[in-house]
């Protein structure tokens, strides 16, 4: 398992376009989260917020990333080591360059999907 890729799902879009709600619906879907650990990187805060107890029920750890300069390979690798996720979901800040995130991916992180809400 140590060498298996970790799928990364990136949600991007305008502020208040429904990213958080959409992610919550996906996490609540048993076909998506069955017995797997998810790390949710939160790169922006809108009106809709996550309840950490609710997330824990679905095997999800919330990790805030408060600025684009915190997207470094070292920081993301430490997150991977700390949480040992089966998958990573990123609620990305639409004002940040997507390239910043992609260039910071540790070796095992593999982009599976980019979802844009409007």
Question: Where do the protein language model's features map onto the residues?
Answer:
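Nucleotide-state-sensitive switch-loop elements of NTP-binding domains
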Residues: 2-12, 16-17, 21-118
């Amino acid at each position: 398992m140590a060498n298996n890729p970790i799928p990364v799902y990136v949600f991007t879009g305008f502020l208040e376009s429904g990213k958080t709600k959409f992610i919550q619906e996906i996490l609540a879907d048993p076909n998506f989260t069955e017995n797997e650990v998810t790390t949710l990187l939160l790169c922006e805060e809108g009106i809709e917020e996550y309840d950490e107890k609710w997330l824990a029920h679905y095997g999800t750890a919330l990790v805030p990333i408060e600025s684009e300069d915190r997207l470094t390979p070292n920081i993301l690798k430490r997150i991977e080591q700390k949480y040992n996720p089966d998958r990573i979901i990123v609620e990305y800040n639409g004002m940040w360059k997507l390239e910043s995130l992609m260039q910071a991916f540790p070796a095992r992180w593999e982009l599976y999907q980019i979802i844009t809400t409007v």
